[in-house]
Amino acid sequence: MITTSSDYKTIRIVSLMITHSCNLNCVYCFEKHKDFGKRMMSFETAKEVLQKEFDLFKTMERESNDRLAIEFFGGEPMMNFELIKMVYEWVKGLDLPFPMMFQATTNGTLLTESALEWFTSVKNDFRIVVSIDGDELMHAANRGVSMSKIPTDYIVKNWPNSYFKMTISKETLPRFSQGVIELTTKGYRVTSSLAEGIDWDKNDANTYKQELLKIASFYLENPQYKIEQPFDLTFDKLRYDTDVPPKNCGVGTKTLIYDTDGQSYPCHLFVPVVHGQEKVRKVVDTIDFYDDKCMINDHCLKCSINKLCRTCYGYNYLDRGDIKSRNLTKCKMLLAELQIISSFQVQYFMQRKGSLNLNDIEKLSDALSAYELLHNTEFDFD
């Protein structure tokens, strides 16, 4: 069964890097080895790797509502659109004995009328995730192209539960709240995150804090809008009784990406188009991604908020040659984020104290614990 219904839980994500080519050149792009047309995944390669994944998923311990997700990735996956259609039709004909879904992550500029017509015909089986980096000025600054090239209203109409991904760069940070609020009031679901690979400074952290405060106030004053990332993050990891915090994503365990030639890698930040062919195999072959101790160094292990810290292991290796070596210029950005969001969640749930369910009460308790830990925390390094 193929379904995007929220009644099912995705427990494994298999991404297909179906092309290294892209029609844009975003300011924060991590794919430094793009080849513009030379490397495309073939239908035979896609079938081979997916059949292997299907056979594996059949044998996994799972609940009846546990789902496998197949994601089309790039580059810009719409530059190999024919493969997307071929893979979908092939998989649909297999009548697999477990739930699954498809997802395409795209910049949206190549969603032609004919492509949209096809996606609409299979919209209950596909989730479309489009990158929009805020308002028109923010999007143009990051991506060098107008938002008018993206059929946003059409996407919202046909995929009301899909979301737009906003990446915040140094250039767009001062307009962050404006971008989120503008898109939200238009009826768009927007998740946001800081760009990786950037040297942030104290002024950036102060700006980020003020922008987060504006968004928090907007959500509290406008309860009709759904809370989105990062404001919906959970603080339950504070309850974990462990000396080594669990890694903050499913890299190499719950996620896997197959490059155009069918070779597998831990995630899309560990593929040759990011690091180059020789460099990436060295780390992939030597790291045990199931061992959390391999993902953090002694410096970060001593940090009082390491259970809440989020890092990108692929970027750590790309920028500093070590998956354990985190971007310390981002620490104050993350601290600002955690301080504002824990405080926000306490206020948010207290506004609804008469109608909280058990899950909400648990989230409120976790947010209170986080607030107590974080509100007086400071980092004394630049």
Region locations from a protein language model:
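N-terminal [4Fe-4S]-dependent radical SAM core
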Residues: M1-S15, M60-N65
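Conserved, mostly hydrophobic/aromatic
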Residues: C22, C26, F72, A104, ...
